[in-house]
């Protein structure tokens, strides 16, 4: 709203959930509304980012909200540096700088300045992929595992690491120790299921995380259906810059 501090804007929406989680931890049961309806809770949010907020705040003796914003800015800068390094290795520095610019100006890059988990997650993803390019499979696996504990989309990184490891193993010139690549790629795959299993054990249902997520935010795995619905609706009836530019960005990525 008008008159609110910029700090409040950087701590809006999901950011407030992360700060709350860093301060109070996870609940031990489902949370319900006054009429008995299931509510969303901090259990919907993966632990990587809030745990780091809590640890850094304890060491630096700063409040959790300030720590959350500072970490997001640091990881946002790391995203730019790591993307530049990875793209330079894959193509050249000119393309790398263009990619960094594209990422930084796309509509939702605003989350790189907010207390969101996206900056940390993307930095871990890029670090893992860069480690793969350098055949540093231990680091790739560790960064991949950490990414899986940061956001559920870590599952997509896990798939990429498995494919890369299989291709690496198929080349005999990489030596007998090349099979370790598969082992570390598998370790990277554990981040997401470990947290989902922990939530299930805590609440007594294997699908507990999905229930909390659906109750609080109405989101489920739909194999990309909502993305295409967003693009279609934005192009047909959207009149806002975020909606239209977001749809155009998705279409540009698809074309590339």
Feature locations, PLM:
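Membrane-lumen/periplasm interface segments of specific transmembrane helices
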Residues: 1, 10, 158-171, 175-256
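Short hydrophobic/aromatic helix or loop-helix immediately within or flanking a transmembrane segment
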Residues: 12-61, 223-231
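Transmembrane-helix motifs of polytopic, lipid-linked glycan transferases
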Residues: 54-55, 67-90, 255-256
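Transmembrane-helix signature of polytopic, membrane-embedded enzymes
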Residues: 63-67, 83-105
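Transmembrane helix irregularities
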Residues: 74, 90-91, 105, 109, ...
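Membrane-interface transmembrane helices that cradle and orient dolichyl/undecaprenyl
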Residues: 91-93, 128-139, 169-172
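Membrane-interface alpha helices of multi-pass inner-membrane proteins
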Residues: 104, 125-130, 138-165, 187-190
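Short acidic/glycine- and proline-prone juxtamembrane loop motifs at membrane-interface regions
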Residues: 114-120
């Amino acid at each position: 709203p008008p008159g609110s501090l910029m700090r409040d804007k950087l701590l809006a929406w999901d950011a407030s959930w992360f700060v709350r989680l860093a301060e109070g931890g996870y609940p031990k049961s489902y949370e319900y509304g006054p009429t008995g309806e299931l509510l969303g809770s901090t259990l919907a949010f993966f632990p990587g980012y809030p745990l780091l907020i809590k640890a850094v705040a304890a060491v630096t003796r700063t409040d959790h909200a300030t720590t959350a914003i500072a970490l997001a800015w640091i990881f946002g800068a790391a995203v730019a540096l790591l993307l530049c390094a990875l793209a330079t290795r894959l193509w050249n520095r000119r393309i790398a700088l263009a990619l960094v610019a594209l990422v930084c100006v796309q509509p939702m890059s605003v989350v790189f300045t907010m207390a969101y988990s996206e900056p940390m997650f993307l930095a871990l993803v890029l670090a893992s992929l860069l480690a793969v390019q350098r055949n540093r499979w231990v680091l790739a696996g560790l960064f991949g595992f950490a990414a899986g504990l940061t956001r559920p989309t870590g599952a997509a990184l896990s798939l990429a690491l498995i494919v890369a490891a299989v291709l690496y193993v198929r080349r005999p010139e990489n030596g007998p120790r090349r099979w370790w690549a598969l082992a570390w790629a598998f370790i990277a795959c554990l981040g997401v299921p470990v947290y989902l299993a922990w939530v299930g054990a805590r609440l007594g249902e294997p699908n507990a995380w999905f229930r909390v997520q659906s109750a609080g935010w109405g989101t489920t795995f739909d194999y990309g259906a909502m993305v295409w619905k967003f693009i279609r609706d934005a192009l047909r009836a959207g009149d806002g810059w975020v909606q239209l530019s977001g749809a155009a960005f998705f279409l540009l990525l698809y074309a590339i």
